[in-house]
Amino acid sequence: MLRFAYSTINWGETPDLPEMFRSIAETGWDAVELFAHSLDWLGSPNRLRRDLGDLQAATMFGVIELPADRIRLGKLRRQIDYAAEIGAEAYGLVGGSRLRWRPPAPEEYDELARACEELARHGAEQGVAVAYHPHVACTIETEEEIDRLLNATQALTLCLDASHIALVGEDPIAHLRKYRDRTSYVHLKDWAKGKFVELGQGTLGIDFPAILRELDAMAFPGWVVIEMSRSDVSPAVSARANAAYLQSLGYTLTARSLAR
């Protein structure tokens, strides 16, 4: 049975935490991914647990920048430690960049792999799976680049995102099958007319029912995080629409009884 969580990305980096969590819970979700909030903003683990109420912190997400110096890596290590303290199972990373839209240089691929592997080994010591998120306009976009990253790492896992896979002309289901042993969790969102939209409203032809059936068939143990980067209405309205879409396919959003 799949476990669903909802990303906080749509509320921005400095939201009113109790209000945001109430809004997510009221729209039907049991778990969240904490997206790029500073530790200062989140507060102590005890405070965050109070703010979460009945919601579960499923995953956290951050940004890795190149060059990956010790200061930047130290901040990410502290984020991973925090993820472990609040019981998050995975920590997602996105980043690197394609300067002027050129392909990354070999040394950029190598540096990203070294930094991600260091963080992944640190996460493994804390019981947190560190996952790189292949992403348009970042160092790792395509299947070939994913292969390069995975061949250079061992502890690192993936956060596969159906929309970003489709945006580079590749098949999300083929990626799920190929990388199932290295995928700790996934992101689902839709795309239309140059922007991300609610599930089922896109124009890329992403077959979300088929993706969910594939995850079900492989008894996927990780979180399925629904993400909505920006909303034309409000974050809460989009969260409710995404919940309704999954429920229309027969899925339940209850996560508490499904803890791994």
Describe each region flagged by the PLM.
Residues 1-28, 53, 82, 87, ...:
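Histidine-acidic metal/acid-base catalytic patches
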Residues 1-9, 56-63, 95-99:
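N-terminal small/glycine-rich loop or linker at the start of catalytic domains
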Residues 11-16, 34-46, 64-74, 99-103, ...:
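Acidic-and-aromatic substrate-binding clefts and catalytic sites of carbohydrate-active enzymes
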Residues 20, 46-48, 79, 119, ...:
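Aromatic/hydrophobic pocket-lining residues that form π-stacking "cages" and hydrophobic walls in ligand
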Residues 33, 59-61, 92, 131, ...:
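Conserved beta-strand positions in the central sheet of alpha/beta enzyme cores
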Residues 41-59, 104, 128:
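Short acidic, glycine/proline-enriched helix-loop-strand junctions
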Residues 48-64, 113-123, 152-153, 208-209:
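Alpha-helix-loop-beta-strand connector modules within alpha/beta enzyme cores
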Residues 67-158, 165-167, 236-237, 255-256:
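Active-site acidic/histidine proton-transfer and metal-coordination neighborhood
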